[in-house]
Amino acid sequence: MLVAEAAERNKEPILQVLRQYLDSAQRGVRVLEVASGSGQHIAHFARAFPHAEWQPSDVDQRCLDSILATTQAHGLPNVKAPMYLDVTWDWKQWGGILPQSLDLLVCINMSHISPLSCTEGLFRAAGHLLKPKAVLITYGAYAINGKISPQSNVDFDLTLRCRNPEWGLRDTSLLKDLGQASGLLLERMVDMPANNKCLIFRKQ
């Protein structure tokens, strides 16, 4: 199993945000996590929401193996087998997920370590797959209307762009525009530890 220190640190703060948008007692809730990574997040969330159905996904086979091992180790029957998913694919290729069938779509720490086409694909698919009034929640470090702060995030952005010119912190104004193009409105930005944010986009 892969273990990411950052995921251990942020899984509980992110869960506290999710609690504001999911009812732990409600049955039949369907959640897709894009770019699930090690599986630590979805295992933590699935324990907190045992009546929801959680679908993890990733494009990296090592992550898919780790997700399976992590969820099996925790004995989580409400987590489906991890799905291979390239987020740039057309939404109709997203594992047979039906249009307007998801109650929540979660994406943690993907947009800044992937080409912009991945973030564009995420918003396009969310516009089709989320139920009306359902939400897309993204988490990470972002530029806010053209400005990156504090200095640690400026340095982080530079490090990412040195590793891959297609990577880097995405601007919330760009994400707002991508959301609107897919019928998603940026409803809220939540300050998180370590200069990160959760962005809440609601499907109209």
Swiss-Prot record:
Protein's name in the database: Methyltransferase-like 26
Highest taxon of the lineage: Eukaryota
Annotated InterPro entries: DUF938, SAM-dependent_MTases_sf
A Pfam family: DUF938
Family of this protein: Belongs to the UPF0585 family.
Sequence positions bearing Phosphoserine: 149
PTM annotation (N-acetylmethionine): residues: 1
Keywords: Acetylation, Phosphoprotein
Coiled coil: none
